[in-house]
Amino acid sequence: MEEFQGYLELDRFRQHDFLYPFIFREYSYALAHGHGLNRYMLLENIGYDNKSSLLIVKRLITTMYQQNYLIISANDSKKNPFFGYNKNLHSKILSEGFAIIVEIPFYLRLISSLEGAEIVRFYNLRSIHSIFPFLEEKFPHLNYSADILIPYPAHLEILVQTLRYRVKDASYLHLLRFFLHEYSNCNSLIITNKSISIFSKSNPRFFLFLYNSYLCEYESIFLFLRNQSSHLRLTSSGVLFERLCLYRKIEHFAEVFANDFPVIPCFLKDPFMHYVRYQGKSILASKDTPLLMNKWKSYLVNLWQCHFDVWSHAASIRINQLSKHSLDFLSYFSSVRRNPAVVRNQMLENSFLLNNAPNKLDTIVPIIPLIGSLAKAKFCNAVGHPISKLTRADLSDFEIINRFLHICRNLSHYYSGSSKKKNMYRIKYILRLSCVKTLARKHKSTARAFLKRVDSEFFQEFFTEEGGFISLIFPRASFALRRLYSGRVWYLDIIFINGLSNHE
């Protein structure tokens, strides 16, 4: 996105926020695709004039407005080379252009807000593991949690209306709305979940932007309501992008809230309420009674149905007691348990024992879903018995070991925060034995015979545990350091969930 600053007239752009002209600029699509449109054109139509990419974009937009577009494309595909292109190629070209263009005002506002407030950017906070220290600190003191599956709208108009709060260019929004309706390939405004799934896979960047805009709008209202119902007022909720009539709407919310709820009973105020979200799943935890959690459950369902016109039901929000149920969040099973400890106290001639049982957050590797992911990837069968990987039998021994080692290290890296290492050891065993069986099958031998034939140092790096690397790097490492490494470790360089771990 930094490359756009060399092309934009920033002062004039910030004054008007016009996005429609960027649709017809060549560099927008060149930056979106990396190598320009020609890469896609040459793959689909060899010999076509590769200098007419901008003209093609204009024709694509023009034909979208024609009511008989599908008829023309079917009848004239042999006469006009333009209509010979794949329709999926059309949507991919335009959607990638739309995605990078609509991000421009948000990126510029983010840069200006960071510069004006002189906020230091902590890139480590982008790590998924940065959430778990927060959970370890807060959740042992809480009683109830609500597992929330945030519904995404099946109505295309909702996604466009969400952008209207932040994008002022009506022409761009009109073209965007028309493109989304044309993509659904139906006259109805309602599309099925299957169509949304196809759109999210074929246009991931554009879909994530629209979905994140919807989440941002939802959470801005939710945080306002949570702030009004809490003793501890939120002083900051991060960087909030500019919205049209934002402060006017906040004043309206405050006025309605004051009129409808002039006095909030004390039992509806909760000073210990915490909210965390990743993608479309969130957790709302509280120290108060289930009555308050059910109240918030009703608030959220009404918010989705009345404000966003998104159908939701109470079953999408499950309220559980933290001490009796586990949280399935970020590919970990997390639960709060009591950690009994006995402390001996000596006072002059008297001594006595103090029994202390503080709560502790346990994070466990979900062994059954993870074995299911390994079975789907053909590393083992459904019950967890390792099998050979057929697709890698044609590689060299070094490449086979290196690929298995890479997968094993990635999983160990992500699940380094597990309270119990036993489940992770089983996953490593499956991967190691699968590697041995793959090599044995390549050399037309059995796993036992292959291990006897190869050198003992052949698998030394593969079978070395992570804890052993500290002894190799620091031979005189203290016992405290080794004990610390054997416990939970959260890394601040993990920005996405491993594919095998993402079983949600």
UniProtKB/Swiss-Prot annotation:
Annotated GO biological process: mRNA processing; RNA splicing; tRNA processing
Q: Please, which domain of life does this record's source organism belong to?
A: Eukaryota
Q: What does this protein do?
A: Usually encoded in the trnK tRNA gene intron. Probably assists in splicing its own and other chloroplast group II introns.
Q: Where's it found, cell-wise?
A: Plastid, Chloroplast
Q: Which InterPro entries match?
A: Domain_X, Maturase_MatK, Maturase_MatK_N
* Annotated keywords: Chloroplast, mRNA processing, Plastid, RNA-binding, tRNA processing
Q: Give yes or no: UniProt keyword Secreted.
A: no
- Write the protein's name: Maturase K
Q: Which gene encodes it?
A: matK
Q: List the cysteine pairs that form cystine.
A: none
Give the organism the record lists: Quercus suber (Cork oak)
Give the CC-aspect GO terms: chloroplast
Q: Which family does it belong to?
A: Belongs to the intron maturase 2 family. MatK subfamily.
Task: Report the GO molecular function annotations.
Answer: RNA binding
